[in-house]
């Protein structure tokens, strides 16, 4: 009987992600797409949007040398990490106009029309997803960065060329950078 329990426990543990980010635990995100220019690019936040490989976020941070965004999940909603009572909150516009646009609003601002706040999750592979789908990166954005989009069934979101699906790998932050990110 004990051997059966041991095998069950081992199988259960093997199915769990290695670095699972718990609710409200701060984390960073790295883009994964083998053989691509976006491979291992850190995710950034600036001008009310999300990017990969942006050289400067122009954010006000506790550690200004760290140019990566720090996030946390709470009940399916995704926030930019801050010690404010009203942190910046992400939204996704999957409408025909938004085509999967990911943005964020400052403080207590409402989401724009068609903006969805909930639907964020971390899957069993430790990938950040929206609506159960991986994210999309499109090249040639500001400062040579890649713009990040939710999968809304549009191959070229925002009419961008060269877009690629990415796995947005979650990495738990041991020393999270507290920032206030720029809005548009």
UniProtKB/Swiss-Prot annotation:
Induction: Expression is highly induced by the V-ATPase inhibitor bafilomycin B1. Expression is also increased by the anti-fungal factor phenyllactic acid (PLA). It is found in: Secreted; Secreted, Cell wall. Glycans are attached at residue 58. Keywords: Cell wall, Glycoprotein, Secreted, Signal, Sporulation. Its main location: secreted. It comes from the Eukaryota. GO terms for cellular component: extracellular region. Residues 1-21 form the signal peptide. GO terms for biological process: sporulation resulting in formation of a cellular spore. Belongs to the phiA family. Cell wall protein involved in development of asexual structures such as phialide and conidium development, and thus required for spore formation. Plays a role as a general stress protectant produced by the fungus in competition with antagonistic bacteria. This is Cell wall protein phiA. It comes from Aspergillus niger (strain ATCC MYA-4892 / CBS 513.88 / FGSC A1513).
């Amino acid at each position: 009987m004990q051997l059966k329990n041991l095998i069950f426990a081992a199988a259960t543990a093997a199915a769990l992600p290695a670095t699972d980010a718990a609710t409200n635990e701060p984390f960073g995100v790295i883009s994964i797409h083998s053989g691509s220019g976006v491979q291992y690019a850190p995710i950034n936040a600036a001008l009310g949007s999300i990017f990969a490989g942006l050289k400067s976020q122009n954010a006000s941070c506790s550690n200004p040398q760290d140019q990566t965004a720090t996030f946390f999940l709470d009940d399916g909603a995704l926030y930019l990490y801050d010690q404010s009572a009203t942190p910046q909150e992400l939204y996704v516009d999957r409408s025909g106009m938004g085509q999967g646009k990911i943005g964020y609003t400052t403080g207590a601002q409402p989401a724009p029309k068609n903006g969805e706040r909930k639907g964020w999750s971390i899957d069993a592979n430790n990938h950040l997803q929206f609506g159960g789908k991986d994210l999309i990166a499109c090249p040639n954005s500001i400062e040579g960065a890649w713009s990040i989009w939710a999968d809304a069934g549009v191959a070229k979101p925002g009419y961008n060329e060269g877009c690629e699906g990415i796995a947005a790998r979650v990495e738990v932050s041991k020393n999270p950078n507290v920032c206030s990110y720029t809005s548009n």
